[in-house]
Amino acid sequence: MTKAPVAPVVLVILDGWGYCEEKRGNAIVAAKTPIVDSLWAAYPHTLIRTSGKAVGLPEGQMGNSEVGHLNIGAGRVVPQELVRISDAVEDGSIALNPALVKICQEVRSRNSKLHLVGLCSEGGVHSHITHLFGLLDLAKNQQIPEVCIHAITDGRDTAPTDGVRAITMLQNYIDRTGIGRIVTLSGRYYAMDRDHRWDRVKRAYDVMTQDGVGDNRTAVEILQASYAEGVKDEFVNPIRIAPGAIEPGDGVIFFNFRPDRSRQLTQALVSPTFNGFERQQITPLSFVTFTQYDSDLPVAVAFEPQNLSNILGEVIANHGLNQFRTAETEKYAHVTYFFNGGLEEPFAGEDRELVSSPMVATYDHAPAMSAVAVTDVAIAAIQKGTYSLVVINYANPDMVGHTGQIDATITAIETVDRCLGRLLESVIKAGGTTIITADHGNAEYMLDDGGNPWTAHTTNPVPFILVEGEKVKIPGYGTNVELRSDGKLSDIAPTILEILQLPQPPEMTGRSLLKTADYELQRTRTPVQVGL
């Protein structure tokens, strides 16, 4: 006997689609979004929090894609690495960290160099400059003879020219403590690529590993000259400032805590099977990463991963149900690795499909990105009728929003809106439920108070829309479904479990966003017409 098709819950994550009533610099308000507008008018909706303590970050700290997907998938507020490491720096326990102490001992015994590599930024998304200061203090206490800093500039999670401020802070700390020197400078566009654009990574790798005469200017002077040429922090050309190449026998600490944009450079430096570009492996090389970038890398890890049990994907799998994940390259790790609590391997019954992102320098040149192809893949999965949960990420609002180009971001938003229309038609035909939300804000705030481009994330809430192909009915409440107004990202997984009529495990401490506890799916419903 043929099984009846499964009516899925489809979770659509509009990456970087925040909510803000201010119209100035708001690409979402400026865009024509008839699909989202009609859904917001016709279906239960609310706003949820995606920043600060609501997602395990310090109060006032903007959220990001890693944190967002981690909280969504875990169904609980997950203490973030930023907080863990900052606490270790503040209370001094970083000085006792076994992996960090060991690498210092190895460097000292060989009388070699210690290299500190990472994003010099106050953004708090991939790193924090205070963590670098903590490492300098550690190196001084460990009496390391030579400390070389390979500084990566931000301009994406911070203002485009905040690099001067960050590098000035760093140089002042070096001068005050008397340890360390900045030996290379590189924009994150090169050193932190995550899309296998190995030509970019190679440029950063080469300046870090090939010694030679340095530039006779200071790091700040180099940045100021770069700005004068229209090249801001993110895109600063890799440059050697002073002697101090990474050589055999040295030690390296990569102090970024977010894995996705740290993985490729680390692979180039340590992997014996690396083939992204031609290079001579540096060996022996002691190497510590702040967090686990990839379980297959031959490195020590300073802050081991937290083990999260009974997360959404695991619960779905444990009940014998199938699930599907898709996104384009830029956000694929988020709907897989991060959504699964930092696990690389899929759960039983979990299928995935990666859609390649377009090969362009920046996504304002291709604001549609691969949204149409992602939609095609998702529709095909829904039409199979075997998946109880389908998770989709649309990267456009975030990735194009990061360019600071408002017109291109408007195009990106409108592209996603059209794709949503097609997607929803397939969910309705399947008798499923669609949840439309976001992981953090971005595209709704693209100009700062001074009218300058804002390319970072925001602390704004994001929309949450519950869309049934047929109107939701709750016993005793008819079609009057209400959603809580105090929700956060960790409440999404419990909501999905309630819709699927699956028990919520005790480890999952989020609360369903449905105000009523006796929500049930009914076979007989009154169709609602939305302008699709």
UniProtKB/Swiss-Prot annotation:
Top-tier EC class: isomerase
SUPFAM superfamilies (UniProt xref): 2,3-Bisphosphoglycerate-independent phosphoglycerate mutase, substrate-binding domain (SSF64158), Alkaline phosphatase-like (SSF53649)
A family per Pfam: iPGM_N
EC number: 5.4.2.12
GO BP terms: glucose catabolic process; glycolytic process
Cofactor: Mn(2+)
GO cellular component: cytosol
Residues that hold substrate according to the record: 126, 156-157, 188, 194, 258-261, 331
Binding site for Mn(2+) 2: 15, 65, 439-440
Catalytic activity: (2R)-2-phosphoglycerate = (2R)-3-phosphoglycerate
Pathway: Carbohydrate degradation; glycolysis; pyruvate from D-glyceraldehyde 3-phosphate: step 3/5
InterPro entries referenced in this protein's UniProt entry, alphabetically: Alkaline_phosphatase_core_sf (IPR017850), BPG-indep_PGM_N (IPR011258), Metalloenzyme (IPR006124), PGAM_B_sf (IPR036646), Pgm_bpd_ind (IPR005995)
Positions annotated as active site in the UniProt record: 65
Cofactor: how bound: Binds 2 manganese ions per subunit.
Family according to the record: Belongs to the BPG-independent phosphoglycerate mutase family.
Subunit structure: Monomer.
Function in brief: Catalyzes the interconversion of 2-phosphoglycerate and 3-phosphoglycerate.
Protein name: 2,3-bisphosphoglycerate-independent phosphoglycerate mutase
Biological source species: Nostoc punctiforme (strain ATCC 29133 / PCC 73102)
